[in-house]
Amino acid sequence: MDNINGLPDDLLVKILSFVPTYVAVSTCVLSKRWEFLWMWLPNLEFVSPWDSRPGIVDFINKKLPIHRAPVIERLCIHINSNPHIKPEYIKRWIEIAVSHYVRELQIDYHSKTKITLQLEAESYFIDGKYLQQLISGCPVLEDLSLRFCCNDNLREFTVIIPSLQSLSLFLFGNSNLNRYKIDTPSLKYLKLEDWNDPEHYSWTNMPKLREAYVDVESSNHLKTLIGSITSVKHLTICCLEDYLYGDGFIFNHLEHLKLCMCPFDSSNLLGQLLKGSPNLQVLDIFEMKRNDIVCWNQPSSVLECLLSSLKILNWSAYFGRPQDRDIAVYILKNACHLKTATFLTDKRINDVRRLKMIKELRLSPRASSTCQLVFGEDF
């Protein structure tokens, strides 16, 4: 013990940084000198086995405000179903973390109202009440993730962040959220899962967007969003309502499109997206799992992307229904530069039907003499 006590404080703090936070804290009983050494740690994790202890909330409330490290590199707090926690505690923890120039912040809290918080300098996850305050304290924020769950008291929120490059929004059903505004001119990546139908939403200023994942319930939301994501190179899209989003939207940079065709048939949406994507190279169709018979409205003329750019077609959960076959045959017949077309049949289809579907596709005409058909089973 005398040997280690002879080391400078900076080196002792460095040593403590290699052990879990709860172990580092336990060294405070060794001597007067060790009482506050752990409070210089730049990384703090109040997680298992601490998260289940009754006094963890009081400990954080008492010690975090007097933490001595000028910069907190990482603060991680996981608290599950603790009756002693209050929203104002979380607010205070956020304020303290921001005041210490936190680089990475995670707060996971599950309460009876299903409010979950997780914040990081690259991926922020927070209840909306304190969102604006947090954003104002992070002027160079690049990655933001928001999750608003059922029974939220949140009514509206605004995200205006000039520096933001990645945004993930998870807006789950039965939320009281009815309006939000997004203004992110530097955004490169967007992930949106919105299962609500807010009264008003505004998406503006995303000229640098390169990749987007869009899963929305309302076609109205899709219509509002579509004009702001036309700069993407990679687009994944799923909409519960098969309605067209309007004319005049061209995805000149779109190279890779993934379209979810369930739970409602989205053949009309597929046709419009193909029509507006003249440089598309890869088309993925997936999760088409309903048996509704909906006609494929074949375009009156051959789409530009089929004539000039489409090289790869991947179709997962292929059912071989009439409209499925019509879409597949249309693409094979007109895609002049198609290299591979992969069809993974749904595992629930029996062997006789599967062989029939494969035969239909093998016998269909192909515009590309070098196109290879690949068949398999979707697991």
UniProtKB/Swiss-Prot annotation:
InterPro entries: F-box-like_dom_sf, F-box_AtFBL13-like, F-box_dom, FBD, FBL13/AtMIF1-like, LRR_dom_sf
Domain FBD: 295-345
Coiled coil: none
Gene3D superfamilies from the UniProt entry: Ribonuclease Inhibitor
Pfam families (alphabetical): F-box, FBD
CDD domains: F-box_AtFBL13-like
Domain F-box stretches: 1-47
Descriptive protein name: Putative FBD-associated F-box protein At5g38570
